[in-house]
Amino acid sequence: SLAGLEAVTDGQIILDGEDITTKEPKDRNIGMVFQQYSLFPNMTVEENLAFGLKLKKLPQEEIHERISKAIKIVELEGKEKAYPSNLSGGQQQRVALARGIVMQPKVLLLDEPLSAIDAKLRKSLQLSIREIHNKLGLTTIFVTHDQDEAMVMSDVIHLFHDGVIEQ
């Protein structure tokens, strides 16, 4: 419901003092990183990052600046012209993360972003995501079913059951 992909059945979603309950997903200013990377296979890393910015009709110079900054943050310098099929799983996930942050959202929602990655790489990406979170000062909601991952990634942990915070 937070991202607007499912209808809210009860209550409201307030973000920065604004009721976004009925807003379309594109109008909520929430960055989203899915479990599956959902990269456009026919677009380079740079083009994948530019896609949402172009939809917002931002000036080309600003698009370039945001992409450069996001590429640096996720440590993918030199991969701007690469296609997803030429990247490792970890690199693809970092592109997905960069695509989430390049839009400068108020909240970054990560929906089990590391579940499809092997254990060794998962630990490394956990640290990277944590560093990015701290560097940007961005409110980040990290959804996981892995208790250890929750402990590593979180400042605050909420346990949900049927949409209700239980603990």
What are these regions (language model features)?
Residues K23-G31, Q35-Q167:
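ABC ATPase nucleotide-binding domains
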